[in-house]
């Protein structure tokens, strides 16, 4: 199994994927620039072979017209934070949402945010989710989605970018947003092996 983790201190992405074969185990920290290049070079199909030794990692993959592409990167110094302690457990509330509807509604609400107020508010009521955003500079927007939710009303606010970006990377029709309250980290996940930990923001409402 290969586990990929990335964080900027305000959000964290975690993805597990199976590997066909491995001759050992280990871990390393890749620079952000290397990850950016890998995203451009990695084919949608085919194999990617990963080698590492000491402070270097090598990636070998198929390129255009059958050519082989090799990327060599230095590994960063230091010890990566214990990401397992960051992933929230025993979350009280799980919201099941249509990925596409949730993504598009967030993107529309995001248009009404500004640099000073880059926040969207989610209010989970009886079988519905209300997404709203407002700013002095742009205006305000509100949209309601139908969903399955029974129980007390829950309200939580996020930087919309921290939800929109992971939603764009997922293929599942349904996603799950899990939380305890408006102050604690929330977990966005799909049925596939991808999880995103997102810190909530304070809302002016």
Where are these regions (language model features)?
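Short low-complexity stretches enriched in small and charged residues
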Residues: 85-87
């Amino acid at each position: 199994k290969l586990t990929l983790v990335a964080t900027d201190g305000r959000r964290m992405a975690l993805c597990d994927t199976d590997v066909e074969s491995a001759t050992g185990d280990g871990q390393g920290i890749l620079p952000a620039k290397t990850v950016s290049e890998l995203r451009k070079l990695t084919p949608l199909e085919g194999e990617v072979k990963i080698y590492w030794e000491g402070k270097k990692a090598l990636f070998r993959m198929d390129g255009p017209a059958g050519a082989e592409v090799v990327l060599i990167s230095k590994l960063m110094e230091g010890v990566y934070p214990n990401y397992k302690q960051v992933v929230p457990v025993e979350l009280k509330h799980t919201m099941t949402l249509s990925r596409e509807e949730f993504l598009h509604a967030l993107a529309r609400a995001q248009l009404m945010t500004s640099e000073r107020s880059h926040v969207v508010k989610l209010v989970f009521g009886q079988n519905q989710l209300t997404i709203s955003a407002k700013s002095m500079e742009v205006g305000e927007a509100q949209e309601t989605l139908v969903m399955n939710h029974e129980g007390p009303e829950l309200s939580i606010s996020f930087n919309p970018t921290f939800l929109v970006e992971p939603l764009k990377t997922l293929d599942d029709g349904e996603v799950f947003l899990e939380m305890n309250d408006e102050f604690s980290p929330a977990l966005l996940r799909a049925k596939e092996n991808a999880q995103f930990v997102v810190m909530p923001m304070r809302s002016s409402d």
